[in-house]
């Protein structure tokens, strides 16, 4: 009682006269990408988004709707999912890809030029800081703690019940 879904393939054809190759960017051969429409998620990053009608709507054995209602709702689910996704990607994909590119470029730049030099500087300076800190501890803090300990060691307390 399922519907067969069709896969829509979209191809764009342009004349060489209307396509300018003088922009300075070396574009790849368009015929190479026309056949490469297979797997757009080779690393399975979004495998959890493969949601079908049966994953969302399920009727147990005891409660079944009419067959026509089930078929129409399944068809409407698939069509609306397809159309809404295409509509949203039409308007949001390019701006969001641009924003993600800016974000990742900024984070990469900050990591390469600020974070890693700071970490390397800290790691380079740490042995000197460790030596200085050990000297300060031995000269100031250890005698102070020893004298406070001696002072409190002479204190005695007696409890009496009166």
Curated annotation (Swiss-Prot):
A Pfam match: Caveolin
One term of GO molecular function: protein kinase binding
Chain positions with Phosphotyrosine modification: 19, 27
UniProt entry keywords in alphabetical sequence: Cell membrane, Cytoplasm, Golgi apparatus, Membrane, Nucleus, Phosphoprotein
Post-translational modification, as annotated: Phosphorylated on serine and tyrosine residues. CAV1 promotes phosphorylation on Ser-23 which then targets the complex to the plasma membrane, lipid rafts and caveolae. Phosphorylation on both Tyr-19 and Tyr-27 is required for insulin-induced 'Ser-727' phosphorylation of STAT3 and its activation. Phosphorylation on Tyr-19 is required for insulin-induced phosphorylation of MAPK1 and DNA binding of STAT3. Tyrosine phosphorylation is induced by both EGF and insulin.
Membrane topology of the entry: Peripheral membrane protein
Gene Ontology biological process: caveola assembly; endoplasmic reticulum organization; insulin receptor signaling pathway; mitochondrion organization; negative regulation of endothelial cell proliferation; positive regulation of dopamine receptor signaling pathway; regulation of cytosolic calcium ion concentration; skeletal muscle fiber development
Cellular component, GO annotation: caveola; cytoplasmic vesicle; focal adhesion; Golgi membrane; nucleus; perinuclear region of cytoplasm; plasma membrane raft; sarcolemma
Segments on the Cytoplasmic side according to the record's topology features: 1-86, 108-162
PROSITE patterns, alphabetized: CAVEOLIN (PS01210)
Top-level lineage group: Eukaryota
InterPro entries reported for this sequence: Caveolin, Caveolin_CS
Phosphoserine modified-residue sites: 20, 23
Record-linked PANTHER family: CAVEOLIN (PTHR10844), CAVEOLIN-2 (PTHR10844:SF3)
UniProt similarity note: Belongs to the caveolin family.
Function: May act as a scaffolding protein within caveolar membranes. Interacts directly with G-protein alpha subunits and can functionally regulate their activity. Acts as an accessory protein in conjunction with CAV1 in targeting to lipid rafts and driving caveolae formation. Positive regulator of cellular mitogenesis of the MAPK signaling pathway. Required for the insulin-stimulated nuclear translocation and activation of MAPK1 and STAT3, and the subsequent regulation of cell cycle progression.
Complex and partners: Monomer or homodimer. Interacts with CAV1; the interaction forms a stable heterooligomeric complex that is required for targeting to lipid rafts and for caveolae formation. Tyrosine phosphorylated forms do not form heterooligomers with the Tyr-19-phosphorylated form existing as a monomer or dimer, and the Tyr-27-form as a monomer only. Interacts (tyrosine phosphorylated form) with the SH2 domain-containing proteins, RASA1, NCK1 and SRC. Interacts (tyrosine phosphorylated form) with INSR, the interaction (Tyr-27-phosphorylated form) is increased on insulin stimulation.
Name the UniProt record assigns to this protein: Caveolin-2
Organism: Rhinolophus ferrumequinum (Greater horseshoe bat)
């Amino acid at each position: 009682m399922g519907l067969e879904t069709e896969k829509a393939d979209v191809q764009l054809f342009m004349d060489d006269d209307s396509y300018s190759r003088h922009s300075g960017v070396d574009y790849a051969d368009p015929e190479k990408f026309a056949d490469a429409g297979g797997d757009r998620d080779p690393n399975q990053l979004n495998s959890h988004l493969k949601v079908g009608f049966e994953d969302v709507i399920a009727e147990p054995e005891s409660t079944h709707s009419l067959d026509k209602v089930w078929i129409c709702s399944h068809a409407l689910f698939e069509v609306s999912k397809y159309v809404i996704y295409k509509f949203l990607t039409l308007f949001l994909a390019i701006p969001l890809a641009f924003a993600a590119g800016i974000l990742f470029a900024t984070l990469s730049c900050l990591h390469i030029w600020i974070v890693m030099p700071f970490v390397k500087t800290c790691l380079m300076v740490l042995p000197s800081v460790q030596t200085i800190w050990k000297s300060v501890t031995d000269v100031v803090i250890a005698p102070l703690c020893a004298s406070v300990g001696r002072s409190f060691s002479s204190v005695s307390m007696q409890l009496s019940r009166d």
